[in-house]
């Protein structure tokens, strides 16, 4: 459980200026519980444009739960499965969390999944919001979630989303496949260039 607000500004110079290394990855996903208890992590930097599963958490799965946490002033860059909080959520839950800051996905074509809260959702998200400035020249981008294949309830997005070149771009989600979104909305500004598919 988190007990104070955390100033993560120093992460900008970590790991040869690549910044924070996400908690959980494809070989060792995060499967535990993190309760922010209403506190924030401020100014975290993760500058990893050639890596996947980027965010505070990279890959969260197998019943894991992240709750009651704010991520503010984040600067995030990754290839695919990129989010302000979590890169990818799989059979896990996020509740009462929010993100602000900037995010960029560098993956090619539709393989760059990126969203203000998380890049790809195959779990459950409840009572969360995101206000991020999100951009990618290629990819599936959403103000809240990039690629949604799970459940989202009582959540919203603001901020702005900019995509181009064969991308799918949405104010709330970039792509929604056989998935449930309830009592949620977006006020994000969406800008599409070239032959992007806006929504």
Show where each model-derived region lies:
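Surface-exposed repetitive/solenoidal architectures
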Residues: 1-199
């Amino acid at each position: 459980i988190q007990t104070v607000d955390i100033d993560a500004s120093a992460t900008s110079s970590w790991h040869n200026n690549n910044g924070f290394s996400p908690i959980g990855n494809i070989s060792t996903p995060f499967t535990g519980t993190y309760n922010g208890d209403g506190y924030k992590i401020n100014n975290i930097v993760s500058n990893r444009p050639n890596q996947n599963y980027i965010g505070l958490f990279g890959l969260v799965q197998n019943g894991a739960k992240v709750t009651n946490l704010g991520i503010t002033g984040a600067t995030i860059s990754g290839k695919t499965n990129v989010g302000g909080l979590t890169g990818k959520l799989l059979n896990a839950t996020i509740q009462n969390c929010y993100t602000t800051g900037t995010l960029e996905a560098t993956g090619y074509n539709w393989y760059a999944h990126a969203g203000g809260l998380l890049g790809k959702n195959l779990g459950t998200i409840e009572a969360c919001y995101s206000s991020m400035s999100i951009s990618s020249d290629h990819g599936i981008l959403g103000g809240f979630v990039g690629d949604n294949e799970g459940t989202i309830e009582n959540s919203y997005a603001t901020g702005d989303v900019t995509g181009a070149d064969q991308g799918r771009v949405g104010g709330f989600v970039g792509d929604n496949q056989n998935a449930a979104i309830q009592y949620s909305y977006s006020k994000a500004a969406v800008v599409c260039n070239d032959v992007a598919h806006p929504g």
